[in-house]
Amino acid sequence: MVDITLRPIDESNFIDCFNLQLGDGQDKFVSHPIRSLAQAYVYRDQCQPFGVYVGDTLAGYVMVIYDYDEETYNIWHMMIDKAYQGRGYGKAAMQRVLSYIASKPFGNSNHVSLTCAPDNKAAYGLYKRLGFNESGRSDEDEVELELYLK
């Protein structure tokens, strides 16, 4: 596995998130961390935003949020900076996120969901390879994918 770490986003590193950049055309697939950090503030009792680090360099961002009404974990705004794409960091980050969720930090659920635009071939393929399957539900132009942790 590619060596990355997840570090909680806090006052020491949130500004670094503003400098993350998507590849050409990817902004239609994922919100920039600025929006996600605003959501993290609003949902702070049920979520954890993470920086994806390669050594001491911020290479990406992802947020885990727990839906107490549906008793499910959601993965929001997964992104890897364009300079780090295609090198396995997204897969490694998702594996770390799933390990974090397996520790049940907010609630006792094994259900994980996320949404993905079907034409985001790289992300969709990654999620499928990690065991996610389409739930049959959608959110606007994105399909919901889900996974049940063992």
Question: What feature does the model see in each segment?
Answer:
Residues 1-12, 149-150:
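Conserved N-terminal entry element of GNAT/NAT acetyltransferase domains
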Residues 108-124, 140-143, 150:
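Conserved beta-strand-loop-alpha-helix junction that forms the acyl-donor binding cleft
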Residues 8-77, 81-83, 100-106, 136-139:
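Acetyl-CoA-dependent GNAT
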Residues 81-87, 118-119:
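Active-site acidic-Proline motif in GNAT/NAT acetyltransferases
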Residues 91, 118-135:
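Conserved active-site alpha-helix within GNAT-family acetyltransferase domains
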Residues 53-55, 147-150:
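Active-site beta-strand termini and strand-to-loop segments that position acidic
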Residues 95, 99, 103, 129:
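Short, well-ordered alpha-helices that flank and scaffold nucleotide-derived cofactor binding pockets
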Residues 84, 88-96:
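Conserved acetyl-CoA pyrophosphate-binding loop and the N-cap/start of the following alpha-helix
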